[in-house]
Amino acid sequence: MNDMPKLGGADPLQAIDELTWELLWSYVRDDYLWFVVGLFGLLAALYFVNYFTRTGSIARATTKEAVRQPIFLLLLAMGSVMLIVNCYIPFFSLGDDTKMYIDCGLATILISSLLVAIWTASLSVAEEIEGKTAMTLLSKPITRREFIMGKYVGIAQTTLWMILFFGVLLICLIFLLKAKLDAKESSLTMTSVECLSTALRILPGLALVFMEVAIMTSISVAISTRLPMLVNVTTCLAVFVIGHLTPVLVLTSLGNVPFVKFVAQLLATILPTLDNFNMSAAIAMDAKIPADYIGYNALYSLCYVSAIILLSFILFEDRDLA
């Protein structure tokens, strides 16, 4: 039997495969290049802060302390188990199981990262202040502002590593299992490139999750400068719930008494609008999240975090550590 004929001296199957991956690369380059650039920019900024500033020594120590905490390993293990188990559980969504799985996976990553951030802020800031450890640190050539900034950066980069770990795991599960299982149930066939393009749809969600966690981390650090863990956890939970409901509060207050409208608009102004970081609707509608939307939310997160960190400086400036 003759071998398969060659086209231009190349195997046609190999040429088709190379063309397919070139199309995938162009798709990634056009839609997700901002993610790669933003991630490397963030990692470069963290590297500079960690190794070229006095704040970095506190940030590195905070990250090491957070990673060694049992709750970090527990949430990492529980989150991984949930992602793996949900991959095999049918959602009975009439062909949209992959969308439901992505939504549940991003929610799992968000909750796990938030719990780590709030818990670490309470331990690393509030208990160090109450246990007089902070006074020992501040007796060295480290200012109170560097202490707060170092704690925030350390907690934020801890959640970043957790989100990246979960993100890689979720992409692998969608690429290797979930997309193919969903297609098989619908009597369809998906190529590896199609499975990978489906898996990469979570990248905007991961970016939005980190922005939301960064905002909540700054709030938790600010509260920890004055209040103990229980109050911190309760307040952050309330801010998280109300922050996701602020658009609803504003809409429902229209036409009501002026006082109710004033309170709703005040809450919407002071508290972060966390619903902007929710991409459940985009997943359900199979809509693409544009890069400018991510950019606007990144700018909003940066401004809000900066304001809360400044508030933390004010709250901690006259705190008695003796």
Regions found by a protein language model. Name each.
Residues 231-232, 240, 317-322:
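Short cytosolic juxtamembrane segments of multi-pass membrane proteins
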Residues 65, 126, 137-139, 220, ...:
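Helix-capping/transition residues at the boundaries of transmembrane alpha-helices
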Residues 53-72:
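Aromatic- and glycine-rich beta-strand/loop motifs that create alpha-glucan
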Residues 1-28:
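Short, strongly hydrophobic alpha-helical membrane anchors
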